[in-house]
């Protein structure tokens, strides 16, 4: 059990540190942006930007760790035993058929959303069937997905930092309802981005940086997915993570009270961009006086 807990806690620590470092570098870069380089901050405002900013990033990393946590909690042989295995397979097959042949919320969204949802569910159902009927495939599947999810985490952190930089250059703030609007008008936004930025070189750069960071930080962890089998470590890590996540949610919300000063840039720099995106999505409004 100790080896499993060491693996999980080590992953959380590395992802959190990477998130905080990325946030620190981003804040320093944004401070030298043309919109903020001439501003003078008081000592208290510097503390808000960097100390509260690091705390907000840690909270966001804790919440974001939930996707990897769910995957690790799902690594088990129990789901391949009768009758659970056939129940799960039936649910996945039914979900695939429903999304593929019926009118669903994905059809309301339009674009390629229905095809993407159908493809994901079909892939999930098909691969679960392979794991169910071919036992030797299970360990390989878990190892590959474990490594892939960790790589995606690193890529998401790098991609988000670069995206926030360009968004700040355009609007002088963290993500807001304009960023949410980008998701609605995806085709138009993608077209504008392709015309305005060197997307291919940037994408290749993000991929290279992601792979280098993943290999440097996680190369000893990527092949350890078999440690995740078992329930004892989950009985300890599960409640601990839920408590940490709830605390992180509360702290992120609590810290917003420090983001209402007269200096808009201090408010924005100390905030976490992903939480600002979530907040804008929930509130569904834009501060027109600010813009």
PLM region spans:
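Basic, amphipathic N-terminal segments that precede the first structured/catalytic domain
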Residues: 289-291
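Transmembrane and membrane-interface helices of multi-pass
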Residues: 3-287
């Amino acid at each position: 059990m100790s080896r499993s807990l060491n693996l999980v806690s080590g992953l959380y620590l590395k992802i959190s540190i990477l998130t905080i470092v990325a946030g620190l570098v981003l804040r320093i870069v944004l401070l030298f942006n043309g919109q903020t380089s001439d501003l003078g901050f008081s000592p208290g405002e510097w503390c808000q930007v960097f100390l509260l900013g690091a705390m907000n990033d840690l909270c966001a990393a804790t919440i974001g760790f939930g996707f990897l946590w769910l995957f690790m909690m799902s690594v088990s042989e129990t789901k391949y035993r009768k009758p659970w295995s056939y129940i799960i397979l039936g649910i996945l097959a039914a979900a695939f058929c429903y999304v593929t042949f019926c009118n669903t919320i994905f059809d309301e969204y339009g674009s390629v959303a229905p095809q993407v949802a159908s493809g994901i569910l079909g892939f999930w159902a098909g691969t679960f069937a392979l794991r169910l009927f071919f036992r030797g495939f299970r360990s390989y599947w878990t190892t590959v997905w474990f490594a892939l999810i960790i790589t995606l985490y690193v890529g998401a952190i790098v991609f988000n930092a670069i995206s926030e930089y360009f968004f700040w250059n355009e609007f002088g703030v963290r993500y807001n309802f304009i960023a949410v609007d980008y998701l609605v008008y995806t085709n138009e936004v993608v077209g504008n981005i392709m015309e305005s930025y060197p997307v291919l070189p940037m994408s290749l750069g993000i991929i290279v940086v992601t792979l280098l960071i993943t290999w440097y930080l996680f190369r000893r962890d990527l092949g350890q997915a078999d440690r995740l089998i078992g329930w004892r470590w989950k009985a300890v890590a599960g409640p601990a993570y839920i408590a940490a996540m709830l605390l992180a949610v509360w702290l992120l919300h609590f810290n917003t009270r420090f983001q209402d000063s007269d200096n808009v840039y201090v408010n924005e720099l100390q905030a976490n961009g992903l939480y600002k995106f979530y907040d804008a999505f929930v509130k569904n409004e834009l501060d027109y006086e600010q813009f």
